[in-house]
Amino acid sequence: MLLQSCGRRACRLPRALRRQAPLGNLGDRACLSCTSLRLANKMTVHFKYCTSVAPVYAYSKKDHYCCWTKGLERTYFTLMSSSGSWTPLAAMGVLGPKYLPVRWWHSSRSLQDDSIVEKSLKSLKDKNKKLEEGGPVYSPTEVEVVKKSIGQRIVDELKHYYHGFRLLWIDTKIAARMLWRILHGNTLSRRERRQFLRICADLFRLVPFLVFLVVPFMEFLLPVALKLFPNMLPSTFETKSKKEERLKKQLRVKLELAKFLQDTIEEMALKNKAAKGNVTKDFSTFFQKIRETGERPSNEEILRFSKLFEDELTLDNLTRPQLVALCKLLELQSIGTNNFLRFQLTMRLRTIKADDKMIAEEGVDSLTVKELQAACRARGMRALGVTEERLREQLKQWLDLHLNQEIPTSLLILSRAMYLPDTLSPADQLKTTLQTLPESVAKEAQVKVAEVEGEKVDNKARLEATLQEEAAIRKENEEKEMERITEAAEKAKETLQVAAMKLESAVDLEPAVLQVKESQVAMDSKQELAKADMETLKDTAPVLEGIKGEEITKEEIDMLSDACNKLQEQKKSLTKEKEELEELKGDIQEYNEDLQEIKELSKAGQEEVVEESKASKRLTKRVNRMIGQIDKIINELETNQKTVDVKLDRGDSPPAGENLISIAELINAMKQIQKIPEEKLTRIAEALDENKDGKIDIDNVVKVVELIDKEDVDIGTSQVAEIMALLQKEEKLEEKEKAKEKQDKEAAEVKN
């Protein structure tokens, strides 16, 4: 069970406490929301942090009734209260074990969006399916090609090369700057990495011969780069064996480089020989209709082009008022930086997407009224004062738009945030929502639609999209810098206040005592300042200290990452590297299968109209060669580890799990890196222990840390636990989907 902050309408709180409620710190009070857990009874449960309850032994006082109901596949917790006010924790009486894991399976797709090849395959399959079913298919209007004069063609060609060379120069500058940051050990944010990936794909597309120059040059200079720039990898890679240290560094860098090159391959658009080049023009006309002329496009146009405004693209370009409105609608914290608001919205949208798949599998009719209300409320739809038939109808409409029509969740939520009348059709609601999107979203979507259809993208459009994203990155970095300056100013102000208080108290002392006091302060200045700081916070704002302790800063996330690397080094474990290598091989296999399927579906007679670019083919060969080198390094490291293990004493029993560590081990490792209060270390470690058995999987912790590190946000311990659970559930769903795909392929082979 995960604690979530409650909305303003959910409770009546004192003003001071209400301000802190969105941050997830309610003192003696907390709200356990069952919106995302989809419990049987949608009542507000009043607990403090993690509640100690167990089946049969749970009881309560003051007209509360609670019980556990265990079904075939679910475990429900039901609580009914006759009191609308908040009840302190003392009102609950609980016996039994300290924690009870309630495992209700939320699953969603991984954070990465579909690649260009996967989107092209989906678009092609969707067209063929609609043609077979006889449904409406969007077909662009046939425009008579006007033959241009020689002078006009020369001007167009000159403009094309001008924008192409300008794009090449700007891409080279940005790539060099980001590469320099990577070499100096700086981590790229999610937005910067996406920009770097797109730029590398553009460079290889503009100059395919770069594959023969850049990639071998990078591989050859890897040992030199590791010597010249030791900060590329954390200090935890330093071991007693120089050879082992060198091999591990090479393994890590080669693996990251291979993964990045494979992502670059998937980012490169395919070439469609049959493409007429009208898609970009059609999209511009469509957006001009809904933004300027007021003309209503067809339903097929609206549904087709709405798919392009993906969650990541939409959220990254929304203004702050729009982000705040979405957070309030979804009952999320609406205070914080834009980056933080986007992060928590992304996590919530993934949860909603997972729930949609589960509800579609079970059927809307199987949900109770309470579950229907919870599901509709979580999606920003009316849940109170609505009949049961209306609840089922609007939820079915949502599932049809989201899962069948593949409309992004962010657009659907935005349409609900605008409180449009229910009489509007879904297409009209989407049209009105698209009108509110910033102009910057349209430019990126225009490039995306051409890439998906396999058409040639104009260099000018690519250049505008690149400059626009670069401006957004600069603005984001400025916000982070302002936030750091503000935090530093607040800390300096607090230190000055503490020093002023000490001087005021010292004035009243006698001269002799004053000298002793001054020497004592000089000797223990750091400890005294920390103590006085804590006492000051307790005296003036008791709630703020709780918030301070619950928040995990960026520095503490880095410290947690270093601690995990040290523990992995102690266990001599290469599990993470093996998993990443297998995942990379799976990505390559999936890419090749998708590519082959696209060629078969788009084949015109005996001629293949879709083909890879030259740069993509050359990069694929390089990645396959690097995978062979990575396999050799892993085998060499494993051979060395086996040799060392034979020399060790065999009397000690092996650990219960290769990657499992105790909470105490993680806390001790974090203590060695940075001085953090014991209580906070314990809370961080317990947040990572999902099933509360005292054991933590290091690899799962590393995945959570990498996700948070890319976003560069400060989050609470409860959110860390939520992310931990979400990533584990995504892995389970991915395995389930792979098994289903395998069965479908086997069934298709049997039919053929």
From Swiss-Prot:
GO terms for biological process, alphabetical: calcium export from the mitochondrion; calcium ion transport; inner mitochondrial membrane organization; mitochondrial calcium ion homeostasis; mitochondrial calcium ion transmembrane transport; mitochondrion organization; potassium ion transport; protein hexamerization
Mitochondrial intermembrane side: 113-205
Reactions that this protein is recorded to catalyse: Ca(2+)(in) + 2 H(+)(out) = Ca(2+)(out) + 2 H(+)(in); K(+)(in) + H(+)(out) = K(+)(out) + H(+)(in)
Recorded GO MF terms: calcium ion binding; calcium:proton antiporter activity; ribosome binding
Species of the source: Gallus gallus
Targeting presequence: 1-112
PROSITE patterns in the record: EF_HAND_2 (PS50222), LETM1_RBD (PS51758)
Keyword Calcium attributed: yes
Gene: LETM1
Domain Letm1 RBD as annotated: residue spans: 249-518
Family: Belongs to the LETM1 family.
Protein name: Mitochondrial proton/calcium exchanger protein
Self-association and partners: Homohexamer.
Localisation: Mitochondrion inner membrane
Entry function: Plays an important role in maintenance of mitochondrial morphology and in mediating either calcium or potassium/proton antiport. Mediates proton-dependent calcium efflux from mitochondrion. Also functions as an electroneutral mitochondrial proton/potassium exchanger. Required for the maintenance of the tubular shape and cristae organization.
Record's bilayer topology term: Single-pass membrane protein
Spans traversing the lipid bilayer: 206-226
Mitochondrial matrix face of the membrane: 227-752
Coiled coil: 443-509, 550-639, 720-752
